[in-house]
Structures are given as structure tokens and as C-alpha cells.
Design a protein with these regions (language model features):
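Carbohydrate-interacting regions of secretory-pathway proteins
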Residues: 17-211
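Hydrophobic h-region of N-terminal signal peptides that target proteins for export
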Residues: 9-17
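Sec-dependent signal peptide recognition
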Residues: 1-8
Length: 211
């Protein structure tokens, strides 16, 4: 078989494999505006096809659609010391860390300002409940890839190809500061981003519903 034919076959196979991996996923952000999103969208902006929290602003923006069990894939970029969060099964009001199922941390964990945090506050952790493994974030200013799977009471986080969290929140009995999380048993809710004044960016956001 000639080399060009082999290369064409390999490229076709790679394309089919990629399509299979994305089967069932639906884009929830069009890269142009906040169509399909709710919450304080004026505190966010679109920068080069990505959702970005405005510096000094924040609040939780979320999909208008509600999800129970799902997988979300996206890319994110942190500025130095950047802080944001993923709203999981968010009810549409209140602090998602407590009133949603959880807030998954999006944090520049290695920045000096975060040297003394509780281990349940670093990137990928279910805030105040379950700690993620550290050491798999790219440098601030670079794009990371992340996948989050939410099924029943379990949450799995894969960062840049490495599993950093696999937790069953129904088994969590000790909470940071002893503060309970009344929303942790929620069965459904919105997906969103919980901004904390830093220009953290998100793009290529796709969600697949699970049974």
C-alpha cells in the first residue's frame, strides 16, 4: 500500500474515533453570546470565543437547561492566581458550593496566595467536601482540558487526561469548617460557572446527558 493511501486511512480512522468519543455531546455555548444562559451574564464577557469573568465581577451564570446525570467537557484558562468554580446541579440561586450539589474548584492551585488552603479547596475538589489530586494543571495562561462526570451522588473529574477526583458525596461526613452542605443530595439542576472576580476563561463547552 502506498504511503499517501496509508496516511489517508489513518487520518480517516482518527476522525472516526474522535467522532465516536464526541457522540451524544451537545455544545451549550455558541462562542458569540450568552444565548441559553441565565444569571448575571453582564458580569461576564466573550473574549476570542470564550466565556470570561470580568475582572472584579462575578456571580454564577448557568445553563437554562437542567441536568440530572451528565458529562461535561470543556477547556479553561487561568490567569495567575485565578479563581472560579463549576456549579453542579445548581438550583439557580444561592451559593452553589452549599445550595447546589457542589462547586468544583477551578483554581491556580500553585499560586503562592493559596499555599495554606484546606486540601478540599484546591483545583478539581468538591469545595469543602472532597479533595482532588494536585499536580496536573498546566501553567497559568495555558489552556487545560477537563471532563466532569456526574452520576447519582458520584463525581469524577479528569484533568488533562488524568483522573484527579472520584468521589461519592453521599459518603462525605466531615465538612470543611464543620459547615453542612444542604444541597449535596440534589438530583438535578443547572450547570454553570461561579466567578470570583478573576478573568478565568472557558470554551468548547459540551454536555452529554446520561441515564
Amino acid at each position: 500500500m502506498k504511503l499517501p493511501v496509508i496516511l489517508s486511512f489513518l487520518l480517516l480512522a482518527a476522525g472516526l474515533s474522535a467522532d465516536k468519543k464526541e457522540k451524544g455531546f451537545k455544545s451549550v455555548f455558541n462562542g458569540k453570546d450568552f444565548d441559553g444562559w441565565a444569571g448575571p451574564v453582564d458580569n461576564y464577557q466573550i473574549v476570542e470565543g470564550a466565556i470570561q469573568c470580568k475582572k472584579g465581577k462575578g456571580g454564577t451564570i448557568y445553563t437554562k437547561e437542567i441536568y440530572a446525570n451528565f458529562v461535561v467537557r470543556f477547556e479553561f484558562k487561568l490567569p495567575p492566581g485565578g479563581n472560579n468554580g463549576l456549579a453542579i446541579r445548581y438550583p439557580g440561586k444561592g451559593d452553589t458550593a452549599y445550595h447546589g450539589m457542589c462547586e468544583l474548584q477551578v483554581l491556580d492551585s500553585e499560586h503562592p496566595r493559596y499555599a495554606k488552603l484546606d486540601k478540599r479547596q484546591y483545583h478539581g475538589s468538591a469545595y469543602g467536601m472532597a479533595a482532588a489530586k494536585r499536580g496536573h494543571l498546566k501553567k497559568a495562561g495555558e489552556w487545560n482540558e477537563q471532563e466532569v462526570t456526574v452520576k447519582g451522588s458520584t463525581i469524577r473529574v479528569v484533568l488533562n487526561g488524568t483522573e484527579i477526583l472520584n468521589a461519592d458525596l453521599s459518603k462525605v461526613k466531615e465538612f470543611m469548617g464543620g459547615k453542612p452542605h444542604p444541597g449535596m443530595n440534589r438530583k438535578e439542576g443547572h450547570f454553570g460557572f461561579a466567578g470570583h472576580s478573576d478573568p478565568v476563561s472557558f470554551r468548547n463547552i459540551r454536555i452529554k446527558k446520561l441515564k
